[in-house]
Amino acid sequence: MEDTPERTPSSESIQPPGLAREPEVTSPGDSEGCARPLDPAPKKLCGYLSKFGGKGPIKGWKCRWFFYDERKCHLYYSRTAQDANPLDSIDLSSATFDCKADAEEEGTFEIKTPSRVITLKAATRQVMLYWLQQLQMKRWEFHNSPPALPATPAAALTENGPTLHLKLEQEEAELEEFLCPVKTPPGLVGTAAALQPVPAMPSALQNISLKHLGTEIQNTMYNIRGNKQAQATAHGPPVEESSQSAEPQRGEQPLISDPSIPEKEPEDPPKSAPRSCVPSGPMQKPKRQSNTFPFFSDGLARSRTAQEKVVALEQQVLMLTKELKSQKELVIILHKALEAAQQEKRASSAYLAATEDRDRLELVRHKVRQIAELNQRVEALEQDRERLVHEAGLREQQVQALQQHVQLLMDKNQAKQQVICKLSQKLTEDLAQPQPADATNGDFLSQQERLEHLKDDMEAYRTQNRFLNSEIHQVTKIWRKVAEKEKALLTKCAYLQARNCQVESKYLAGLRRLQEAAGAEPGDFPELLQQLVQEALQWEAGEASDSVGLSPVSEYDDYGFLTVPDYEVEDLKLLAKIQALEVRSHHLLALEAVERPLRDRWATLTELMPSAELKQLLRAGVPREHRPRVWRWLVHRRVQHLHSSGCYQELLARGRACEHPAARQIELDLNRTFPTNKHFTCPTSSFPDKLRRVLLAFSWQNPTIGYCQGLNRLAAIALLVLEDEESAFWCLVAIVETILPAEYYSKTLTASQVDQRVLQDLLSEKLPRLTAHLGQRHVDLSLITFNWFLVIFADSLISDILLRVWDAFLYEGTKVVFRYALAIFKYNEEAILRLQDSLEIYQYLRFFTKTICDSRKLTSIAFNDMNPFPMKQLRQLRAAHRERLEAELRELELLKAEYLERRASRGRAVPEGCVSEDEGEGDS
């Protein structure tokens, strides 16, 4: 047997197999193409490091004993390894690590937490890299570990060990560009480092922590008592007996073994320790040792066969425990369901058995009290939901901080890579230049020494670069795990709220049935029931309005439109989700860069007047809080010669007195209006009724048009922004009667057809490549663009861009519609040119407007790239195409009249053998 110190059981049993690996790599310089073997057993992460801290004259490096706690993911430190209580701890769960190649002292690295930055220094550079890699590994294991199971620690560790071992091996195979694992420095880390003498400091006072003076005093007193006990037992029984029977005195010290975890074989001693053969009798007594690190003989180690059997049995026990737990949960669920059914049956029987109204009223009051109790439970659940949402917000802030740190590390990495490239290029140039013949020997030696320094710097930067790559990769993985946990919390909130709504709806249905059954009888309880129903309805509406913000990417925007469109094609659903995320991203970026300055400018505009500044502000978009006021002013400018007080109410009165012929078509189109908007699909919403009244009033206002499909979308947009139905009515009047040309919504849609031909000419002028490409494939764009002009892009663009278009459209007129139509094609020109098949082009044109997310880019194209765009040219094109279209319509009317005249002249002759429809069945 070798005379080497044995490890304590805690150093082997705390970490599961396969988690802490000790690769056989000698130095960071051999990191390229290095092998990654694993040590047979994990080692405890502990050792002496220097910590920079203190204030005033005591500020400087202080030697501290660091040890890692896997349960909390904390790195504790104390003054010596024998101290009973740690001075402080560092939370590694949200920490990042950094090392600087150009540090003043070798082995310096940093641990950055959200609250502070801890600067540490290792004895050598290899020890520093070992600590950094091990801390990264421990942090990832903590974030990636599943929740604790109700079983013995040994069984849980044995079960999770092989799985994590395989995962880590797979990850290492994929990350060859990262820093290879560093070999364990012998005698400097692990439990063997505790046996080494404490590194000497310049003065004893410098190593004392004044910040934790109370803990220092406690540790000193404990060490004094421990030394006295060691001296008292020096003449007692042999060391091996006392070490085997002694109980650990400090359960909090992480180096003490856990008796519930089986002991493993002792690992190989450090290479630097001398080896000598000793007899198998009693062990030699060490010169000096602490009671924190007991020694065990090699005979206590169990065989691997017995260990494997124990592990297999523990795994089987854990599996049976899980199965028993699931069976118990199933029995509890079935028991609760049975109790609920029996309680409902008893309540129904009691209600039917009651002969008098008083008894039934008492039963109803009992149910009301139960509802009150349920409301209290709902409030408690709501508080829990708010707490979870708050925690999710804190997690999101933490994730943002980590992302910023990752970006900072990437910037540093890029800058250092540039430095490496410059140094390499300079080195190559220096080597390529021939040395002068008269160069002295001293110059050559200095240049050679400088070259060696540069090589060392390059190697240091290369090592730092690889470490930072691994740090960025691991922080990104941790961020993803945190995002998944946040999503799970939000899903849980939504589930609890859904269950709450189910309970409320169940009792609400019961109350409604009671109200219908007893509404005609005298008494006070019908009024009470009616009041309860109204309160429940109001509560349900309030809960529905509060549930919008549960998703990280909101399902609806500020005006109620779905941010994720409901496409029919399966592949387009993924595109829709991506588009929703892009919209959110552009919105957040615009909020910081553009929206806030724009809102400040709008806030200073107290009085609106036509001007060039107002024109530019409207093109940039009106903030949501100012949009209703601005739109009312724009509409009033358009219809002030038509507006009269009481006109809208008179039109509504006419509609109530007499049914309009278009009322049936309006009723049919109400359900087709924005089916993805929650304001028009919710059964309790008042928007459909408002829209019906606005469209009926317009039908009486303009009998020439009456009602045309498409007007419902225009009125709906006005309602969503202005919220007042009379203001929405006058907005519809302004669009149809003052902004758009006449006969835009006539039976023949003459003006709409003219605009389609004008758009084709403008496309040929502004986008000749796209026009030629579509012409070669016989693509008719009017099939797509006709609806754009008819409803001013409603249901085509996302709501944020759509309302920006309307902001400028209400002020400048139809020229804005042409500008944005051309800008949409310019925005997607390259994507359309890549499509070669006409069917693919039509499929793409059907939804490509929904893929536009960057409103600033689209606005810039519309009002900058499409210039010049004179209104005079637009009027001339409209006049020319209108003349041609009217000539074509007259020709069609002549052909129709000739056909009718020719048909009338021939008469309705019946061929022989055929029976006319005018003949009765009885005729022969």
From Swiss-Prot:
It comes from the Eukaryota. GO terms for cellular component: anchoring junction; cell junction; cytoplasm; cytoplasmic vesicle; cytosol; nucleoplasm; plasma membrane. Residues 42-140 form the PH domain. Residues 261-270 have a biased composition (Basic and acidic residues). Residues 1-38, 228-296 are annotated as: Disordered. Residues 303-332, 361-418, 444-477, 871-906 form a coiled coil. InterPro entries: PH-like_dom_sf (IPR011993), PH_domain (IPR001849), Rab-GAP-TBC_dom (IPR000195), Rab-GAP_TBC_sf (IPR035969), Rab_GAP_TBC_domain (IPR050302). The keyword Phosphoprotein applies. It is found in: Cytoplasm; Cytoplasmic vesicle; Cell junction. Keywords: Cell junction, Coiled coil, Cytoplasm, Cytoplasmic vesicle, GTPase activation, Phosphoprotein. GO terms for biological process: positive regulation of GTPase activity. GO terms for molecular function: cadherin binding; GTPase activator activity. The keyword Coiled coil applies. Residues 1-167 are annotated as: Interaction with CADH1. Residues 621-813 form the Rab-GAP TBC domain. Gene3D superfamilies: Pleckstrin-homology domain (PH domain)/Phosphotyrosine-binding domain (PTB), putative rabgap domain of human tbc1 domain family member 14 like domains, Ypt/Rab-GAP domain of gyp1p, domain 3. The modification Phosphoserine is found at S916. Residues 297-435 are annotated as: Interaction with RAC1. Its main location: cytoplasm. Acts as a GTPase-activating protein for RAB7A. Signal effector acting as a linker between RAC1 and RAB7A, leading to RAB7A inactivation and subsequent inhibition of cadherin degradation and reduced cell-cell adhesion. PANTHER family: RAB GTPASE-ACTIVATING PROTEIN 1-LIKE, TBC1 DOMAIN FAMILY MEMBER 2B. Interacts with activated RAC1 and CDH1. This is TBC1 domain family member 2A. It comes from Rattus norvegicus (Rat).
